[in-house]
């Protein structure tokens, strides 16, 4: 008898079965079903027992692993968003798309997007994320080793000095698995040049154990989204009845007592959460007064601000709450300046109007642009897109978003001519010619 122990594979995080169908949890938040077509197989938890002649048993073992690999490549589904998830690995480039991979904007900060998909359904989401999205048709997950390999290439290109890896994306970054390994790998690379790793999060996935592990892995800062303290308002903004603001505040205080810098990032939705926005600011200031952190950002030689106030903007495929008023940044900064003055009169110095320089962000060598806007080029279509009417093509070590397509599935595998519409920050958008 030959045994196949599925628990030895890191990406397989849970195993169930229904008769001869394996139901595998992949990287915590994904799932596949694999029908095992062999009579000689007995499934016992994560152990598959193969009762056959040794040579036949080894062939069956290889066959089962091939079926699992095929299912991950073609039938992966998110348990969070219920969408098909495309597993990204070599040879798909990781530069060119906003939904996954790496984004480099000619600065010392590199945005790391290991996956997309969110466990909340925020009413203001700029990318229409969550289970009830009306525009997103596919999610993506990037293989950890492939992500790190490509990240290191960009860091080396920038000569590895004062680099910040920032985990963000179209979704909740902390849902990526293995998150701790990702942070540790990034931190190991960046610390050679006095760099850091930071992460955006809505906080819902975090717990004491995970925070301890992220601290040990070398995470420098958590940008924690808190948009209201009122329980009813917080649930409404998040689009989830089970959103627990008390749990988020408890997590905030736990982070504050760790070696990870806490930055609270409230979002103002004018005419919706104006009062709650101010309350979140007050909460953050009080927390800093009671428990000041002394964590120094090596990029600046100073402490990071406690607050990163943001203004809700309207985006083409994003959500816009009906009652929300649209403000420009001049009006927003005027409001923040007013709040700063109020604190100054109380003898409290609070920085609410922040800039990238406050976090050590500065210009650095930019990756070359392989395409010019208006250029016509040939592209190999390799994957279905993130939204309806989009497919993904590959050319010159870039992934290209080809928009306004019909019959997307018929294009996959073909070489097509496209016209480049956008190349800013190496985010490449094109249309068929």
UniProtKB/Swiss-Prot annotation:
Q: What is the lineage of its organism?
A: Archaea, Methanobacteriati, Methanobacteriota, Methanomada group, Methanococci
What SMART domains does its record include?
Elp3
Q: Which residues form the TRAM domain?
A: 370-433
* The family this protein is said to belong to: Belongs to the radical SAM superfamily.
Official protein name in the record:
Uncharacterized protein MJ0103
List the GO molecular function terms.
4 iron, 4 sulfur cluster binding; catalytic activity; metal ion binding
Q: Which UniProt keywords apply?
A: 4Fe-4S, Iron, Iron-sulfur, Metal-binding, S-adenosyl-L-methionine
Cofactors, names only: [4Fe-4S] cluster
Q: Where is the Radical SAM core domain?
A: 104-349
The annotation note on the cofactor reads: Binds 1 [4Fe-4S] cluster. The cluster is coordinated with 3 cysteines and an exchangeable S-adenosyl-L-methionine.
Q: Which residues cross the membrane?
A: none
Q: What InterPro entries does the record point to?
A: Aldolase_TIM (IPR013785), Elp3/MiaA/NifB-like_rSAM (IPR006638), MJ0103-like (IPR040088), rSAM (IPR007197), TRAM_dom (IPR002792)
CDD domains, per this entry?
Answer: Radical_SAM
Positions of [4Fe-4S] cluster binding? 118, 122, 125
Where along this sequence does the record place binding of S-adenosyl-L-methionine? 171-172, 236-238
């Amino acid at each position: 008898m030959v045994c196949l122990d599925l628990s030895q594979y890191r990406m397989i995080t849970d195993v169930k079965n229904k008769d001869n169908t394996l139901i595998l949890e992949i990287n915590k938040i994904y799932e596949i079903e694999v029908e095992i077509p062999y009579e000689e197989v007995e499934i016992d938890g994560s152990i598959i027992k193969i009762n056959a002649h040794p040579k036949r048993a080894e062939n069956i073992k290889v066959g089962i692993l091939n079926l699992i690999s095929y299912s991950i490549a073609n039938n992966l589904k998110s348990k969070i968003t219920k969408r098909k998830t495309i597993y990204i690995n070599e040879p798909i480039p990781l530069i060119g798309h906003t939904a996954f991979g790496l984004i480099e904007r000619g600065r010392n900060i590199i945005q790391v997007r290991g996956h997309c998909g969110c466990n909340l359904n925020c009413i203001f989401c700029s990318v229409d994320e969550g289970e009830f999205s009306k525009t997103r048709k596919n999610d993506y997950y990037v293989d950890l080793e492939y992500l790190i390999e490509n990240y290191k290439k960009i860091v080396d290109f920038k000569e590895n000095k004062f680099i910040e890896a920032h985990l963000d994306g179209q979704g909740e970054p902390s849902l990526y698995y293995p998150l701790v390994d990702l942070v540790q790998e990034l931190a190991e690379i960046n610390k050679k040049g006095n760099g850091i790793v930071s992460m955006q999060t809505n906080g819902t996935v975090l717990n004491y154990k995970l925070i301890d592990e992220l601290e040990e892995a070398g995470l420098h800062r958590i940008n924690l989204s808190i948009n209201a303290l009122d329980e009813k308002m917080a649930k409404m903004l998040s689009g989830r009845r089970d959103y627990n603001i008390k749990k988020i505040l408890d997590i905030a205080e736990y982070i504050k007592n760790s070696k990870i810098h806490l930055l609270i990032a409230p979002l103002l939705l004018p005419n919706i959460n104006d009062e709650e926005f101010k309350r979140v600011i007050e909460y953050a200031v009080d927390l800093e007064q009671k428990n000041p952190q002394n964590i120094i950002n090596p990029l600046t030689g100073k402490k990071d601000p406690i607050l990163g106030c943001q203004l809700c903007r309207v985006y083409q495929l994003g959500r816009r709450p009906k009652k929300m008023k649209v403000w420009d940044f001049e009006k927003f900064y005027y409001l923040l300046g007013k709040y700063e003055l109020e604190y100054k009169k109380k003898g409290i110095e609070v920085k609410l109007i922040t800039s990238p320089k406050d976090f050590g962000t500065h210009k650095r060598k930019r990756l070359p642009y392989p395409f010019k806007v208006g250029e016509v080029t040939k592209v190999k279509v390799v994957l279905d897109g993130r939204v309806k009417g989009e497919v993904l093509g590959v050319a010159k070590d870039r992934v290209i978003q080809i928009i306004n397509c019909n019959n997307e599935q018929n294009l996959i595998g073909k070489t097509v001519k496209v016209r480049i519409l956008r190349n800013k920050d190496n985010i490449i958008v094109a249309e068929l010619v």
